[in-house]
Amino acid sequence: SAAGRRPRGTVSIIEDIAFREEVLGEALEQVRGVLSDYGYGNAVMWGHLLDGNVHFTIFPDINAQEGIDHYASFMRSLVDVVLYYDGSLKAEHGTGRNMAPFVKDEWGEEIYELMWKIKRLFDPENILNPGVLLNRDPDVFIKNLKQIPLANELIDKCIECGFCEIQCPSRHVTLTPRQRIVIYRELSVLAEQGKTISKRYKELKRAFN
């Protein structure tokens, strides 16, 4: 897959946006321009053009603050293009924390506050998907990002999506494939930090074996 061929140490981020038919071609040219400007020219794009729905996958390097800042600038530029063409920031898939900070930009202050009012009526304690659909933190989409450390040339191809787990014959015997890879990556990080005698390392090593 494209994700398996991405540069080592990068993550795979998938988004989907939508435009009206009459502006779709021009809008897509602008989206491709933004992708290229930010070094994501190798993005994989596909979609359902009759619905104006476009998916894309990019592979940013977020292992350092510079990469995170670069990704943040890309997202803001992408949102600007979508809003300029009066498009939708989400099409088939849920909003999620990656787009939540931009919901207000898309719908405007009045409708956004109405959304919050409805949210408080049904979820006064904010326990249902807090911050996933509505979030007042403008930087939430670049916080608590899951980085993928270098561990092994083969394992580095994995994006931890879990799609392989249902087919794995060992998933009910020991660890699932994703669990094993996550532990392997953490062991690699701890070893690089010289923490091979730590309690955490020993516990993970025991689980891995």
Regions found by a protein language model. Give the residues of each.
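C-terminal substrate-recognition/cap domain of FAD-linked oxidoreductases
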Residues: 1-73, 79-81, 85-86, 96-97, ...
